[in-house]
C-alpha cells in the first residue's frame, strides 16, 4: 500500500503532466492558427523564395509558403504588370479578398519578376528587357541570370508547393490572375503550364487574364476587323511574322517547346480561363503593343480580348472559357480586380467551369 506522501507525489506528478499536456495542446492549436500579413507598406509582407540554386525571387504574401497552414482553402497567384510592382498587385488582390471575406482562408502570393536593369542581388532570377515593354518574363522565357529558369517554371514551382498536402491540406482552389503584362503571362501560362494538371484531386486551378495586350493564338487565323461581330476569320496576307510566339505557336520558347503543339491546342480549351476586359480599355497610349503582330489581333485591348474570345467560340466549340466585360473601367488593375465582375472571377463560388458548347 502506498504511503500518503507517495500518493501525494504521484498525484502532483499527474497534475503537472496533465497541465503540461494541456499547455502543449493549447500551444499546438495556437501555432495552427496563423494571422495573415495584410500590411501594404513596402517590405512588410515580403519574403524571399528560393526555388533552386541561384533561383531566388522576392514575393509578397499573406501567409508564408514555407509553413504548414490548415486555414488555407484558396490561393491566388497574382502577376504584376510591366512596371513589376508586386506590392501594388498584392494590395489590389488583398482589397478584393477583404471585400469578399476571403482574407483568413486565402494565401495571396505576388512574386516579382525583375529585369537586368533592376540590378537584383546575387542569386536572384532576372529576365531580359527586350524592346523596352516586351519583357521576357511575360511570355515564360528563360531568365538570363545564372540560373536560366523559365518564368513559367516559377509558377509551376509555386503551385507544387501549394499542392503539398502536408503544408496546405485543405486547399481547394487556385486562381492565377494578372492585369496587362500580368494578363499576358496568365493567358500563356494557362496555355502551357505543366503543374496545373498535376494538382492533387480536389484542387481546381483557374486563370483570370485581365486586359492583356496580346494573346497567343492556336492557329493562323485572325479576325477580319471590318466585321464587328468577329464572325469573319482569315489568314492574313502579310510579311509580318504574326504567328510567331508570343502571338502564335510558331517558334515557341524552350518551356513551351517541351509540349507538342497538338497537346497545347487540345489542353487549352479545357482550362478554366476568364478574359476580364475593361469596357473603356480602348486607348493605344502608354505601353500599348502597336506591333503588326498585335494589331492583327485588334486595334485596342478590348477589341483584342473580344476577338480572342470569339476565336475560342469559332474554333473550339467546347471550352471552359468566358469573356467578362467590366463596365466603365479602362486600363486600371485596381478597378478591374475590385469590380463585382473582378471579385467574382478571382474568388468564384464553388462549381462552374464545365465544358460548354460555344454558340
Annotated model-derived regions:
Residues 26-75, 83-107, 132, 136-147, ...:
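A domain-start/cap signature at the N-terminus of enzymes
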Residues 80-84, 213:
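Active-site glycine-rich loops that stabilize anionic/oxyanionic intermediates
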Residues 153-171:
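Conserved acidic catalytic loop of the alpha/beta-hydrolase fold
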Residues 178, 182:
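Gly/Ala-rich beta-loop-alpha elbow adjacent to hydrolase catalytic centers
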Residues 183-196:
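Short glycine-enriched nucleophile-adjacent loop
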Residues 201-314:
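The feature captures the conserved acid-bearing segment of alpha/beta-hydrolase catalytic domains
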Residues 276, 289-290, 309-359:
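C-terminal catalytic histidine-bearing segment of alpha/beta-hydrolase fold enzymes
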